[in-house]
């Protein structure tokens, strides 16, 4: 499990870096998003992953990796929005937004490690495309 934790921390660091850069550029503009808007964004990203896998080509020079990063970040935004509720404007500082990001990333890590213990990392035995399809189906189910 040590490798899983390190892999998670590496991926979250990449996601956090992009979140921080966008926060610097735009501020917490996402605070105005309602839960349905956040899940719509996650659905759009998951659907693009499926489209890229199906078609095998893209017209926009951004691959699947960027979409997964966006899904992680929108997921954390969604958790923040559920905690704070949506706002009429960007009502928190960048520092507060980053602290909330870190809080939910830590909670996700703890939950993943607990589930990995109980399920013995069964997800590692799944075929990658099945894992992605399952992820997309779950997004669609909750949207």
Q: Model-derived features: where do they sit?
A:
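Intrinsically disordered, low-complexity regulatory regions
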Residues: 1-138
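Catalytic phosphate/metal-binding cores of nucleic-acid and nucleotide-processing enzymes, i.e., regions
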Residues: 140-143
